[in-house]
Amino acid sequence: MKTDAHKNVQKKVGEKAGLIDEKTKENYFTIEVTNATLASECTPRVGSAPLAPTRSIFLILDINATLAADVADKVGGDPEESYMPLVAETFSVATEQGTPDRNVTSETAWGCFDDSVLLPPVVNPGQTVTGKLVLAVEVTQGRVAYDPQENGGWSWPYGD
């Protein structure tokens, strides 16, 4: 298993990542970046004029995520509070110096696309969700990481 300098397991675009139940060896959470596109503008949620990034460029991710219905049984805790966050704040990119840039949100990135095509903010037990997530980034090539607890997650390439 190849990891980057920030303890994120490296994946290819289209390759699933996930958390595995040690007993059953089955995934109870999966996340997959199926496409990573750079864009100098996006279609707005409201209005018709395209939005431009306030940072260098938009990084538009197409993501699939699934959370098992019985996740609370596997990890313990309250089923009502068992979910995985999918908001922009759980993602980062590496700066040119190699440090994580967790400031990948912006008002214009949030304003991109209609809600019907956007990734929901969480995946709940028993759900599979699909959608776009727009990040505001400075670096046009590198790796985008999903690491909600900032202790090691997964990363996918972009801008290649």
Language model feature labels by segment:
Residues M1-D160:
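Conserved functional micro-motifs across diverse proteins
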